[in-house]
């Protein structure tokens, strides 16, 4: 019973870490990264469609991204969506592909992005702690109802705390890497 609670909590904590990883990948670092465009919606035949469903991405150089639409009639719609986005890139349409050159980040902008990343990391930590709180309540309920012994409950809470620490450490490691990437890029 406690193992089910721990297994579920560990899975949900892992999902929180994965969500943080995804969030971090959407923060610009000055390098061309297709993940920057993962949340960008293009008005394709009047329907908001994720850019990743409309085109393939290549990075021929560190700061250049080539976007090749599967349907060439979508070129202008994709270009318009890129121009209207807050990514800060200037797309160039040559009739076949869209070339996006990522501008260098200023020191001020880098520090702003570091603050954003810290906020996303804190959100992930809170998410992990919430999972821990719910799992701890479930373990306490099992002990209170007499389904498991008090020793097993304490052992389960100790294992839960270890899993929580492990997942928060993973978020901190992701944060450290992203911060180094932002400030060192």
From Swiss-Prot:
Any Gene Ontology CC annotation: cytoplasm
Pfam name, any one: RRF
Example GO molecular function: ribosomal large subunit binding
Keywords assigned: Cytoplasm, Protein biosynthesis
Primary residence: cytoplasm
SUPFAM superfamilies: Ribosome recycling factor, RRF (SSF55194)
Annotated GO biological process: translational termination
Annotated CDD domains: RRF
Localization terms from the record: Cytoplasm
Source organism, top-level taxon: Bacteria
Assigned protein family: Belongs to the RRF family.
Function recorded in the entry: Responsible for the release of ribosomes from messenger RNA at the termination of protein biosynthesis. May increase the efficiency of translation by recycling ribosomes from one round of translation to another.
Name of the molecule in the record: Ribosome-recycling factor
Higher taxonomy: Bacteria, Bacillati, Actinomycetota, Actinomycetes, Micrococcales
């Amino acid at each position: 019973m406690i193992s089910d609670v721990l297994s579920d909590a560990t899975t949900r904590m892992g999902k929180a870490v994965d969500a943080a990883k995804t969030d971090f990948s959407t923060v610009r670092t000055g390098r061309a990264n297709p993940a920057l465009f993962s949340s960008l919606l293009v008005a394709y035949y009047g329907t908001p469609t994720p850019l990743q469903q409309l085109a393939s991405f290549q990075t021929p150089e560190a700061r250049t991204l080539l976007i090749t639409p599967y349907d060439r009639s979508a070129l202008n719609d994709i270009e318009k969506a890129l121009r209207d986005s807050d990514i800060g890139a200037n797309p160039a349409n040559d009739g076949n592909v869209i070339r996006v050159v990522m501008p260098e980040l200023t020191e001020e902008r880098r520090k702003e992005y570091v603050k954003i990343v810290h906020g996303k990391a804190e959100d992930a930590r809170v998410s992990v702690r919430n999972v821990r709180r719910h799992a701890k309540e479930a373990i306490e309920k099992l002990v209170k109802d007499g389904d498991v012994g008090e020793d097993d409950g304490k052992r389960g809470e100790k294992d839960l705390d270890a899993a929580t620490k492990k997942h928060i450490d993973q978020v901190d490691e992701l944060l450290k890497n992203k911060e180094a990437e932002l400030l060192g890029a």
